[in-house]
Amino acid sequence: MEYSQIHKFDLKAYDSILFISKSIGTYCAAKLAHEYKLTANIYFTPLDFTLEYLQQKDLVYSGTKDQWANFDKIEHYCIYHLIEFHSIVDGNHSLETGNIQTDIENLKQIMYRVETFIHSL
């Protein structure tokens, strides 16, 4: 895969690099992390073809009703490969459930875990 912009940076100059990505961006971030041996990543609603590049040090969120990804496949892959996985019950590809109160509570929990995850790196 050719990354015309990434070559402008000396990635070895950084102690850690964290990508936070969503949907199709999870594939790009995961492939970059794999190829350049980067630090952990946070993936929101990854697509099925992203899975082969996920690593144990990653954090993954997926909705149980994601219309663009196979939730069961992602969940099983993460569990089998010991990747931290969080499901959003009734969440779609935007992790929205259709209930604003539930969505706000989910978002609070997600952001708390993202914050602690980042501080743990």
Which residue ranges define each predicted feature?
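Catalytic histidine-centered segment of alpha/beta-hydrolase-like enzymes
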Residues: 91-106
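Conserved alpha/beta-hydrolase fold motif
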Residues: 16-19, 41
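Short beta-strand/loop motif that positions the catalytic acidic residue
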Residues: 54, 58-62, 66, 74
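Serine-hydrolase catalytic machinery in alpha/beta-hydrolase-like enzymes
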Residues: 1-16
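Acidic catalytic loop of the alpha/beta-hydrolase fold
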Residues: 64-69, 93-94
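C-terminal alpha-helix
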Residues: 109, 113-121
